[in-house]
Amino acid sequence: MPHIYKQPLGIFQGFVPTLTDAEVSFIAQRQLLTLPENGELPDDIEYEVDLKVTFANHRLKRAYIALQAWKKAVYSDPFNTTGNWHGPHVCGYTGVFCAPALDDPDVAVVAGVDLNGADIAGHLPAELGLMTDVAMFHLNSNRFCGIIPKSFEKLSLMHEFDVSNNRFVGPFPSVVLSWPAVKFIDVRYNDFEGQVPPELFKKDLDAIFLNNNRFTSTIPDSLGESSASVVTFAHNKFSGCIPRSIGNMKNLNEIIFKDNSLGGCFPSEIGKLANVNVFDASMNSFTGVLPPSFVGLTSMEEFDISGNKLTGFIPENICKLPKLVNLTYAYNYFNGQGDSCVPGSQKQIALDDTRNCLPDRPKQRSAKECAVVISRPVDCSKDKCAGGSSQATPSKSPSPVPTRPVHKPQPPKESPQPNDPYNQSPVKFRRSPPPPQQPHHHVVHSPPPASSPPTSPPVHSTPSPVHKPQPPKESPQPNDPYDQSPVKFRRSPPPPPVHSPPPPSPIHSPPPPPVYSPPPPPPVYSPPPPPPVYSPPPPPPVHSPPPPVHSPPPPVHSPPPPVHSPPPPVHSPPPPVHSPPPPVYSPPPPPVHSPPPPVHSPPPPVHSPPPPVYSPPPPPPVHSPPPPVFSPPPPVHSPPPPVYSPPPPVYSPPPPPVKSPPPPPVYSPPLLPPKMSSPPTQTPVNSPPPRTPSQTVEAPPPSEEFIIPPFIGHQYASPPPPMFQGY
């Protein structure tokens, strides 16, 4: 880590211990106790403070009140940065900058605060809203906790706001939306959560840094209205598609989507981004082939799409983009590439094609692994993320409706295919995206963004159940998820505090392009305006290995860059995780319970005969399998069959199911299953099993399986909340 710091900050090297969760909670509570009603300050608050000192003007008095309140809110100041914060001469305080007021050149006011890298622990008092002349607020690489006070809305002259690499929590700080002149917003490396407001992208901003937080939901369609040159979404939990409006971002130079739960096909509109230098969509769940429009990315220098589920051919023209320096498409399922795309064919371009399905190339996936994905290509013309109707899936579900129930008992074998899951190596890659989402609905309805809506309804309806198997297969995909420790990622970056120089805000947009290729930029990266400010490279430390690949991001995205490229390779090991699914056969019984339901759902279908009984299994997931089994017995006949049902799929048990010829009746009794479903929370699961058993494993799953991976609908990341202890 020492190499991350510049001279002025060299003394920081691991010298001060980080805050414990208990301390963070304590500081947050201190802030809550001091916040006024609604977090707003009365206009006459300064008159409520009895001061025996005189000030050059009223504004400096207000600044004094604010800074003294802030000093009292400091919990730890290892370098005594605020040691001289006493007396009326606030312009002499360390980290405080004064300048002539914009509305009156004869009046000196506090125009900026720069405490970058001071390693101060504490919270932000509401009184800071008194410094209404502040245009620059830089706090990156400290240990501030709590929330951004609502009183910050009064800082209407704010131009640069950098609170990166701290421990702030709560929803996106909406106060930034009230600043008419703000150009630079950096909230990286914190614990902000929830949705990002669509209004953020409607502001006239130069740079937006959201990476390494806990944001969820989809990326707003308003993204295309942004005037920003740099936008980073990396290392969060965004799901869904890349908005097609992205093609309208005329000023965009760098955009990072790395390590989220995004999926579907790439929208062809990306090809309109003729000014983009860095595009990183690695470690997600994108599917389909690369749009031909990508040939329009004529300014592209760093292009990373590794760690996804992309298939097809890497076109020659993409590998010959005029300014291309680095193209990484490892950990996908490409089965062909142009001659210019072969690593080593172009000395001036770094190419990485490992862990694909390319013939005659080293370090590729096994034939079995590739077959699972390549045999089920995704039709992007029908994918909603690419602008298609995405109705193919629903149509399929109706067709299988009642006819296939009996025929598909054998399909259960397909479940192993999910085991192959195409995303094995990438899985380790990705860290958090998939896991959180899958738990909520193993049904996988949301995952199949394109077809999920249709598939889910069918599942519940009598015929649709057939598609349910697809969800099961999807489950393996989530398993692949590299979703292992995005959060851990976040904290390591702290080092890059060299931001004090940031004051020069004008440099915002320029930094990005220049810094791209050279990893060194990270130090310069901090506040966009001043390359130095961007040093917040806290991210670099975290993702130190990848820095080379994403060095471009450093320009404005220094921290993210490191986070971006190398990671994919690191996680190659995870693929094994999916191999287990094949064994699913033996564990079918457990599947019924809950974890495996997605993968094991196929087995239940096999037991179509005892579907009635099987419907109860849904309850088993809840851990009350017996009860459900008993209740259904009357309608279905013999509860025991259910127990046998798990095994039947593959072995002797099948006879029992056969004995329960009732299955045919089952179709008539479908009504009963519904009843069963009503008791259990998983009603959908119950009704489908009866009929779907046979249908479930159908070809539909295979075709859909691959599409579902996108996880487009998952927004239920429950994990994030737990992370906020004490709030």
Swiss-Prot record:
Glycosylation sites: 80, 326
GO molecular function: structural constituent of cell wall
Residue segments, region Disordered: 381-727
Post-translational modification: Hydroxylated on proline residues in the S-P-P-P-P repeat. O-glycosylated on hydroxyprolines.
Gene of this entry: PEX3
Chain intervals with Pro residues compositional bias: 397-419, 446-457, 466-479, 492-677, 718-727
UniProt KW Repeat keyword: yes
SUPFAM superfamilies, per the entry: L domain-like (SSF52058)
Protein name: Pollen-specific leucine-rich repeat extensin-like protein 3
Tissue localization of expression: Expressed in flowers, stamen, pollen, and pollinated carpels.
Organism whose genome encodes this protein: Arabidopsis thaliana
A Gene Ontology term for the protein's cellular component: extracellular region
Key word Transferase present: no
Keywords: Cell wall, Cell wall biogenesis/degradation, Glycoprotein, Hydroxylation, Leucine-rich repeat, Repeat, Secreted, Signal
